[in-house]
């Protein structure tokens, strides 16, 4: 609801006054002396003045080895002020299609002056921009993904091996080699990075492959690089050309133009929908370029995310995409693909902080290449720690490159690491009832499942001290992101615990909060704390279908205080 406000002119200024702020504006081009906002009579902001910011997120971690600077978020530790410039954002029309950019040069600013009321700021941002949609339940299970030239037999055999080892999976990702990557005439057509025709050398009967994946209870997503359009060798080219009013005999490439509504309609209807009817559940949009639109100013990535997400919802089921972050408001189109990360300890050490801090923009569902993608070397300890983080991150998606030394099957890393990783992946599956309830909490109450601990404890200095500590729903997680000591075989992690008593989930040890503690953990354990009174619903069977309610539950209870938990089951 619009708050009560007073609007008047005085001393050559327009004044807008609410209970909490006083805006003064000279009604000229914005300037530091012409536009200012005073919050609660104390904090004064002038246009163009930078204030401290707790960070938000970035478009991608491509080519980032370790840490990178983050774009601003909505939260500020010192001044409690942030400003979002929304001037160049595409506007959605009443018919659901983006409107042409008007190019008036006008400024469209949103001012947030919440002080340390961090949770309220994020909740109100969701009210302004729409809540995070409800995810399909299956997205919370374990995913398998690898950039590798799989055949149908090899892929299905791998899925069967995971099942034989009682390692649950819910989503199978097929990277770009599902389609033809060697074009019939490279001089004429260019590379096969973009493609839409199944490669029969690897998938001689792709419909049967998809049917077999469904028999195994797996959802399927395929990788797309749409940039190079649809070329004459593609199976659907003649039909698409005719539907777009073009002569297929010319063999001219149909350019990919995300601003062309007619093209986009047929891109879905003619190119993608038939595959969805065959069993593809959603698409991994691997867009890495800036161009791809005939209209200046259109962010092609933003348009792709919007169009794909809306289209995937057309049959009434909960939609899903996997794509890079396209700017503030992208929380409306989950999930986020963070890009091709490096296989290094430095990359792992950055990801917990990076993931949680995105909640400062309401961006709740990052999906990382768990284990990394680029470069690297075979390191059982590194991969085990990465899997542990993945289990306690928004999306648990194992991923790797074609490098045979870095493929992420747990049994490739020795008996100790294999057993630990498989136990964690089973735990992830058992956590689905808990996480699914957190999905609803995010949707209804505006509280992301993964967020910095200072969201809940904004006035306690210790909450800002441990960058890789975060809230995982009601739990406090602090994944190990550094090597263990070669003598003790223990890894040190410093954690801040709020006031109260806490139980370490893996050891059962009880800690008194209100302080920083140094934890030392062997490879099989990571710091995970449940406050006294916490109730954690777990699926009794780790191999239960992640997409349906489990037949039986087990409850983990952290004793020492009364507690309650609202379990959501709606499938």
Q: Residues of each region from the PLM?
A:
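Structural recognition of the beta-strand scaffold that forms the well-ordered cores
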Residues: 74-75, 80-83, 140-143, 170-174, ...
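Flexible loop/turn segments at secondary-structure boundaries
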Residues: 81-82, 89-92, 118, 148-151, ...
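Aromatic-lined carbohydrate-binding/catalytic grooves of carbohydrate-active enzymes
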Residues: 133-292, 331
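Conserved, mostly hydrophobic/aromatic
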Residues: 20, 73, 162, 213, ...
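Catalytic core of carbohydrate-active enzymes
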Residues: 309, 329-336, 350-354, 358-368, ...
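Catalytic and substrate-binding clefts that recognize carbohydrates or anionic sugar/phosphate headgroups
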Residues: 5-137, 146-147, 152-153, 157-164, ...
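Secondary-structure transition/capping motifs at alpha-helix termini
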Residues: 133-135, 163-171, 205-221, 273-281, ...
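Alpha-amylase-like alpha-glycosidases and glucanotransferases acting on alpha-linked glucans and related
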Residues: 245-287, 316-344, 398-421
């Amino acid at each position: 609801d619009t708050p009560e406000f007073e609007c008047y002119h005085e001393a050559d200024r327009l004044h807008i006054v609410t209970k909490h702020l006083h805006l003064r504006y000279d009604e000229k081009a914005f300037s530091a002396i012409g536009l200012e906002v005073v919050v609660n009579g104390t904090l004064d902001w002038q246009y163009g003045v930078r204030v401290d910011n707790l960070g938000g997120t970035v478009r991608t971690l491509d080519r980032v080895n370790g840490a990178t600077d983050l774009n601003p978020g909505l939260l500020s530790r010192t001044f409690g002020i942030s400003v979002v410039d929304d001037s160049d954002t595409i506007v959605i029309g009443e018919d659901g299609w983006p409107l042409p950019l008007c190019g008036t040069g006008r400024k469209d600013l949103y001012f947030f002056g919440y002080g340390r009321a961090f949770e309220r700021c994020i909740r109100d941002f969701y009210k302004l921009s729409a809540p995070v949609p409800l995810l399909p339940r299956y997205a919370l299970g374990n995913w398998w993904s690898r950039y590798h030239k799989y055949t149908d037999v090899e892929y299905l055999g791998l899925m069967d091996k995971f099942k034989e080892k009682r390692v649950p999976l819910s989503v199978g990702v097929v990277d770009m080699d599902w389609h033809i990557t060697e074009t019939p005439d490279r001089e004429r057509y260019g590379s096969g990075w973009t493609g839409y025709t199944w490669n029969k050398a690897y998938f001689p009967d792709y419909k049967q492959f998809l049917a077999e994946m469904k028999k195994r209870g797996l959802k399927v997503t395929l990788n797309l690089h749409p940039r190079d359009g649809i070329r004459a060798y593609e199976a659907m080219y003649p039909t698409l050309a005719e539907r777009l009013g073009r002569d297929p005999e010319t063999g001219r490439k149909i350019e990919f133009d995300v601003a062309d509504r007619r093209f986009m309609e047929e891109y879905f209807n003619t190119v993608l929908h038939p595959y969805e009817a065959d069993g593809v559940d959603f698409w991994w949009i691997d867009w890495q370029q800036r161009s791809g639109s005939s209209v200046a100013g259109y962010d092609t990535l933003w348009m792709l995310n919007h169009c794909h997400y809306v289209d995937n919802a057309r049959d009434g089921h909960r939609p899903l995409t996997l794509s890079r972050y396209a700017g503030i408001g992208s929380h409306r189109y989950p999930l986020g693909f963070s890009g091709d990360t490096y296989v290094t300890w430095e990359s792992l050490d950055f990801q917990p902080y990076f993931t949680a801090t995105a909640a400062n923009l309401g961006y709740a569902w990052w999906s990382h290449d768990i284990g990394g993608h680029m470069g690297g070397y075979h390191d059982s300890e590194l991969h085990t720690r990465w899997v542990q983080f993945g289990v306690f991150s928004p999306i648990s998606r194992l991923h790797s490159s074609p490098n045979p030394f870095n493929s992420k099957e747990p049994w490739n890393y020795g008996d100790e690491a294999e057993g630990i990783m498989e136990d964690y992946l089973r735990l992830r599956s058992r956590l689905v009832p808990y996480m699914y309830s957190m999905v609803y909490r995010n949707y209804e109450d505006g509280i992301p499942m993964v967020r910095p601990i200072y969201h809940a404890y904004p006035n306690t200095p210790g909450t800002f001290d441990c960058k890789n500590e975060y809230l995982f729903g009601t739990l406090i997680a602090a994944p190990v992101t550094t090597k263990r000591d070669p003598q003790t075989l223990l890894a040190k992690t410093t954690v801040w615990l709020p006031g109260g008593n806490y139980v370490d989930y893996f050891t059962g040890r009880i800690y008194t909060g209100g302080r920083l503690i140094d934890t030392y953990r062997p490879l099989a354990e990571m710091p995970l704390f449940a406050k006294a009174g916490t109730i954690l619903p777990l699926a009794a069977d780790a191999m239960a279908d992640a997409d349906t309610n489990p037949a039986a539950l087990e409850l983990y209870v952290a004793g020492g205080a009364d507690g309650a938990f609202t379990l959501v089951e709606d499938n």
